[in-house]
């Protein structure tokens, strides 16, 4: 269907007229200067929470003389987020199956056993149990 007469655009070859471009830049500059002077509330920088510092601390405990690249840190951070997401989803399903509204350490432990394979699950469960015991004894 051909465009209506009111919808036709001027044929300038896709470019704006030369006289308008500098004026638009000046106006944009004025807007940013006005925002910087305090007319509007300044928006704070959004914080991105990562596990980078914790991964780095563990790396230094295991291999004190080894470094890690930014890309490798990003991959490990994605890995940790993925595992936590899987465990949380599985624990949520387990709580729903048992008609409970609270995820406890028992659901977390069961979901870890279901998600992680064999020996890895055993080590994860023992480390988790150790961490919960340590926390419980220090909280008193």
Curated annotation (Swiss-Prot):
Crosslink feature (Glycyl lysine isopeptide (Lys-Gly) (interchain with G-Cter in SUMO)) location:
8-9, 25-26
For this protein, what post-translational modification is recorded in UniProt? Monoubiquitinated by the ubc2-bre1 complex to form H2BK123ub1. H2BK123ub1 gives a specific tag for epigenetic transcriptional activation and is also prerequisite for H3K4me and H3K79me formation. H2BK123ub1 also modulates the formation of double-strand breaks during meiosis and is a prerequisite for DNA-damage checkpoint activation. Acetylated by gcn5 to form H2BK11ac and H2BK16ac. H2BK16ac can also be formed by esa1. Acetylation of N-terminal lysines and particularly formation of H2BK11acK16ac has a positive effect on transcription.
Source organism superkingdom: Eukaryota
Skewed-composition ranges (Low complexity): 11-21
Which molecular-function annotations from GO does this UniProt entry contain? DNA binding; protein heterodimerization activity; structural constituent of chromatin
SMART domains found in the cross-reference section: H2B
Basic and acidic residues composition-biased segments: 1-10
For the cross-link Glycyl lysine isopeptide (Lys-Gly) (interchain with G-Cter in ubiquitin), the position is: 134
In the record, N6-acetyllysine modifications are located at 8-9, 15, 25
The record's keywords, sorted A to Z, are: Acetylation, Chromosome, DNA-binding, Isopeptide bond, Nucleosome core, Nucleus, Ubl conjugation
A GO CC term attached to the entry: nucleosome
According to its UniProt record, what is one Pfam family this protein matches?
A: Histone
Residues annotated as transmembrane: none
Q: Where is this region: Disordered?
A: 1-48
Cellular localization per UniProt? Nucleus; Chromosome
**What does this chain do?**
Core component of nucleosome. Nucleosomes wrap and compact DNA into chromatin, limiting DNA accessibility to the cellular machineries which require DNA as a template. Histones thereby play a central role in transcription regulation, DNA repair, DNA replication and chromosomal stability. DNA accessibility is regulated via a complex set of post-translational modifications of histones, also called histone code, and nucleosome remodeling.
Q: Which PANTHER family match?
A: HISTONE H2B (PTHR23428)
Q: Of which family is this protein a member?
A: Belongs to the histone H2B family.
| Subunit relationships | The nucleosome is a histone octamer containing two molecules each of H2A, H2B, H3 and H4 assembled in one H3-H4 heterotetramer and two H2A-H2B heterodimers. The octamer wraps approximately 147 bp of DNA.
Indicate what this protein is called per its UniProt record: Histone H2B
Lineage, broadest ranks: Eukaryota, Fungi, Dikarya, Ascomycota, Pezizomycotina
Its gene?
A: htb1
